[in-house]
A protein has these predicted regions:
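Sec-dependent bacterial lipoprotein signal peptides
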Residues: 1-18
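Cystatin/cathelin-like cysteine-protease inhibitor module
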Residues: 19-138
Length: 138
């Protein structure tokens, strides 16, 4: 009798893993591409609470990687030159966001990490783990 709850929990876990990985199967077959103005706004809006004087910020945009899904979640790394909520981080701040892509377009963004100063290397390392490089932003 005790095996049934464990089996049910294991089966539920396996099924949830299958459904969450389905989005990764609709991967784009095209090359990397530049973000549209609307996509840039989506990402910039998600960074608003992490920077001061956003109207003065200068965004450096990296291309969207070729392996980004047509529908699903992807990671994106780039950088912003702005004042931070934490003054030691003022200046160039690499960031990592998770974006939701629908029909090949970024429709939402959530900040995973942003840091400037000597801690910028932490974000660069996080990006590198996912095959991304915020230093490719222009």
């Amino acid at each position: 009798m005790k095996r049934k709850p464990i089996f049910a929990a294991g089966a539920a876990f396996m099924l949830s893993a299958c459904t969450s990985s389905l989005a990764s199967y609709s991967v784009s077959t095209s090359a990397s591409r530049e973000l549209t103005a609307d996509e840039k706004k989506v990402i910039a809006d998600s960074l608003l609470e992490h920077i001061r004087e956003p109207e003065r910020a200068r965004y450096l945009w990296a291309p969207l990687p070729a392996d980004a899904p047509v529908n699903g979640l992807a990671r994106y790394c780039a950088a912003v030159n702005a004042k931070s909520q934490h003054p030691p981080y003022n200046g160039l701040q690499p960031y990592l966001v998770q974006v939701q892509i629908s029909n090949g377009r970024i429709v939402s963004s959530v900040v995973g990490s942003i840091a400037g100063g000597s801690d910028g290397r932490i974000v660069r390392n996080l990006c590198a783990r996912h095959g991304l490089n915020p230093d490719h932003a222009a």
